[in-house]
Amino acid sequence: MKYLQAIGIGGYILLVGLFLPLRCLAASITPQEAELYFTSSLVSMAAYSEGLNIMTREWLQESGWYFDSRENINKVADGRFHLVSRNLRGNQSVYFLAFPGTERLKDAEIDFRVKRVVFGGKTPQEFKAMAALTDHNGSQPLVHQGFNDYIQVALFQQPLDEFGNRTAGEFLAQELRENPNEILYLTGHSLGGASATLAAARFADLGVRPEQLQVITFGAPAVGNETFARLYEHKMNLTRITMAADPVKSVLQSLTGGFVQFGKKIVWKNNKFERFDHDMVLYLDQSLRAYQDTHPEQEPTPAMMQGTPVKLSGGIYVAPFEFKLDKKLQQDMPYMRRSLKESLQQAYAPLILSEFKEKKSLAALCAEQKQAGARYVLLERFTGHQIRNEHNNFRMMMEEELYDTDGNLLTMQTTSATTQNLTPIEAMVYLQFQAKEQRDKFLQ
């Protein structure tokens, strides 16, 4: 796809950097906000390049999202962003731009490049010249040098022919200026969130209206001094989502003694998982919970959450999910059940969910399958048990069987994972997705 070729007057640009009770210390959020935070956390998770993050990206792609990933590298920074898009109803398109957090050595160097530089200018050349000034004081807008370097390299370093010999940042800003009804959302986790905030400030300096700039960050540190905060807090709409015990959100205030936060603050509390409170998987878990808690299961799926299911001849009859979980995990069973159901609904159509409320024999399931006109019967059993001598680390397992209309076994498989790098609900969805490749070989 040619870069941003689908952007038009009637489209929406959403620029932003995996369904689970909300532990929120802030005011209640609306269903629309929960949907946006959930989508932003998914895309922010997919912006990283590790195995689990790539799986999230693949899941989004199979659900109808397209990733256009860009990378500009020089000795200063490895500037990266992902433009994530999909088509909605009514010939509208939605765009997310995700900035990854720290995952490379050069990213860590960026984080610790804490010298303050002047932030200003109206062109990429002026941006660079202002940051090079050595004579400055607190009355000027000053920002974290490393974060500023990152955005300069990622968005404003390299003019390209496909952008009319302009940088990606200039091109995007012009699209927004020419289409003032379009909305721009920016997001990311940690370094990615800081990058999203500075990118919004740059777009503001390029003439983009404040109401077009919506920023959502997860565990992001402050990026600038008091002057910067007061100058730009009305030039964008910033929502900062943090975990209560996340140390990164305030680390720069301690290191520099002069950086301040601004914007709307939402605080989520991690009172279950004993891991570093800055992990993106925790932010994803809480945003998933918020989404499910504000969207009743019987309501239609919001447009951005809808998948593009594969059309099957006859469809799949899904038996009731079976769970055998340790007591610590049982409170999450409703969220697991809904997440697993919605994941299958996004993957296949038609999908018929069993009306049985309890375990039934295969013969009874096949009888109901035939009555429903389905071609396949899918059985999935899930277990979750604490690993011996490992506090709050669980072994999650899924056993899956796929049968035809006569009750003949087509395939069976077992997948497992621990919760070392995932929350229990995320692990269940991960196991189901891991089984998809083998399952699909037998579906027509």
Regions from the PLM with identified roles:
Residues 170-252:
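Serine-dependent carboxylesterase/thioesterase catalytic core
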Residues 66-187, 205-212, 235:
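A conserved cap/lid and substrate-binding interface adjacent to the catalytic center
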Residues 225-308:
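Lipolytic serine-hydrolase domain surface
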Residues 222, 298-349, 440-444:
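A structural "domain/chain start" motif
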